[in-house]
Amino acid sequence: MEKVKIGIIGGSGLYSPDFLTNPKEEKIYTPYGPPSSHVVIGEIAGRKVAFIPRHGKRHEIPPHKVNYRANIYALKELGVERLISVSAVGSLREDYKPGDFVCTDQFIDMTKGRVYTFYDGPVVAHVSMADPFCPELRELCIRSARKLGITMHEKGTYICIEGPRFSTRAESRLWRQFGADIIGMTLVPEVNLAREARMCFLNIAMVTDYDVWAEKPVTAHEVARVMAENTEKVKRLLADLIPSIPEERKCQCARALDEALI
């Protein structure tokens, strides 16, 4: 099995590997069951990349049913060290507008009933999540967005809810009081599993609409239009970001388990 150091998990809107050259599918078996789909290995600007659509090829897997452990394990088996997660999100702030991107730097976990760790015993891991996202990847991502003229907010707190339903207005107002900037359903447990796998993790959050706190009428047509535009923008962003990633890691992400195991 060929080794691939960079992985991409595609969210809503990013299901097809058509942004990769020389794509080929790899079927990977994991102790946690099958991943969301076969892993597609291809290239971006000459760099090998492994891609998994989080919700399956046709968005047939809801967020609370995604096999997050299998997805991360499959990418780890391929040798992935840097993982780029792409997510569609709602905005909890007036200035984070539909069509904007956010380079997430913090998260709040409001999920329930998901499987959050690879270490269910007898070995237990308590990984630090004080700074959940790789500073090296975040810096490169922000730089690429600026270069391409893509509006990207350099910081943002992502509140992850269980789904698949959306928030009530009361909940949406509460999330704003919590200090959350964007809302989605898939960041957790993806981010903590990647940390346990010693991966560098980056989340590119694409704002599709305002959450219900704003009480602004949103049509399915408008959301679909923004999502399509976001998908094309994120492909351009990935095409610029991937070749800028250095071969060797200088961050501390690979040492996440050094003092975490009991």
Swiss-Prot record:
Domain of life: Archaea
GO cellular component: cytosol
Pathway field: Amino-acid biosynthesis; L-methionine biosynthesis via salvage pathway; S-methyl-5-thio-alpha-D-ribose 1-phosphate from S-methyl-5'-thioadenosine (phosphorylase route): step 1/1
A biological process term (GO) from this entry: purine ribonucleoside salvage
Record has Transferase as a keyword: yes
The protein's Enzyme Commission number: 2.4.2.28
Subunit structure: Homohexamer. Dimer of a homotrimer.
Role, per record: Catalyzes the reversible phosphorylation of S-methyl-5'-thioadenosine (MTA) to adenine and 5-methylthioribose-1-phosphate. Involved in the breakdown of MTA, a major by-product of polyamine biosynthesis. Responsible for the first step in the methionine salvage pathway after MTA has been generated from S-adenosylmethionine. Has broad substrate specificity with 6-aminopurine nucleosides as preferred substrates.
Record-given protein name: S-methyl-5'-thioadenosine phosphorylase
Native source species: Thermofilum pendens (strain DSM 2475 / Hrk 5)
